[in-house]
């Protein structure tokens, strides 16, 4: 497979493990497979996690074999993440990156503390092999606590887009890979994505990011996704 899920297959096979691949996402089939095959690791996007949380069979399914549930590719509501920890277990780990560079940050299992959910809105801490900077439009690092674009340098960064020199030059402005994700960093170095750069709304002189609104909406337990 061509996306980041493929990076998990060789290491599993090299350790003598088995890989179960479904043709599509069927929540009941996923739950049944985890229980029957004693699956230890799976990779899901937040929408899939939300669907599993809403499935009537979840609480009757034996998920005790599951040691690691990796999620990524989109933000996850902190409210739903807390629900996942309570109902699925302390197995969540977030990896952030993109096809042009992966992984860039990790929010480890130990960071998913349901008694201290302050990091649930974070996309993690930079992995050891990458250098991350939050840059403004001029390619300068923003002051601590302010929002800037996540930019990266490291061995896992692509060289170029195939036969697309103009796009390559644009995405590597100022010598950094520009992810298009806007974020701020806390004093420990954890990054908090506020939204995609192109999704920012300027209204009344303020920058409004849809994700901030969505996270507030999903604090209502009657709302599954926003």
Enumerate the predicted regions with their spans.
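Alpha-helix capping/helix-boundary segments
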Residues: 26, 48-49, 76, 157
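Generic structural signal for well-ordered beta-strand positions
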Residues: 20, 142-143, 186, 192
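AMP-binding/adenylate-forming catalytic core of the ANL superfamily
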Residues: 34, 42-45, 154, 159-160, ...
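Structural motif
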Residues: 23, 37, 56, 221-224
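Gly/Ser/Thr-rich phosphate-binding loop
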Residues: 9, 14-17, 31, 39-44, ...
